[in-house]
Amino acid sequence: MSDGVKHINSAQEFANLLNTTQYVVADFYADWCGPCKAIAPMYAQFAKTFSIPNFLAFAKINVDSVQQVAQHYRVSAMPTFLFFKNGKQVAVNGSVMIQGADVNSLRAAAEKMGRLAKEKAAAAGSS
């Protein structure tokens, strides 16, 4: 996508992203969720700013159309942001998830993931 966000349409598509990208930020949202709509432009901006192919991706997962993934990660409130490293859920800045449209926490997490991914990409000889 031109905004840098990868829209996930199936559990297999999400599994593939986790297997091919070192760091992933996942936004679990619903079309009917007001706070999800409110934070979406900021999430897209973070994706545009920090995404690095194969090193950091920003995914959006609709909890109504990809229920299997939402249930697997026990997402019960929207939006919920989860963080992954090498396919496994990890904590960023002390939290394994951010629930709600908390722009400051999301910005801090995106910046940290961006720094980590940039370091890995540089070490791998990618820019």
UniProtKB/Swiss-Prot annotation:
The active site is at C33, C36. The record marks G34, P35 as: Contributes to redox potential value. Keywords: Disulfide bond, Electron transport, Redox-active center, Transport. Gene3D superfamilies: Glutaredoxin (3.40.30.10). InterPro entries: Thioredoxin-like_sf (IPR036249), Thioredoxin_CS (IPR017937), Thioredoxin_domain (IPR013766). The record marks D27 as: Deprotonates C-terminal active site Cys. CDD domains: TRX_family. Residues 2-115 form the Thioredoxin domain. Disulfide bonds join C33-C36. SUPFAM superfamilies: Thioredoxin-like (SSF52833). Belongs to the thioredoxin family. Participates in various redox reactions through the reversible oxidation of its active center dithiol to a disulfide and catalyzes dithiol-disulfide exchange reactions. This is Thioredoxin. It comes from Neurospora crassa (strain ATCC 24698 / 74-OR23-1A / CBS 708.71 / DSM 1257 / FGSC 987). The lineage of its organism: Eukaryota, Fungi, Dikarya, Ascomycota, Pezizomycotina.
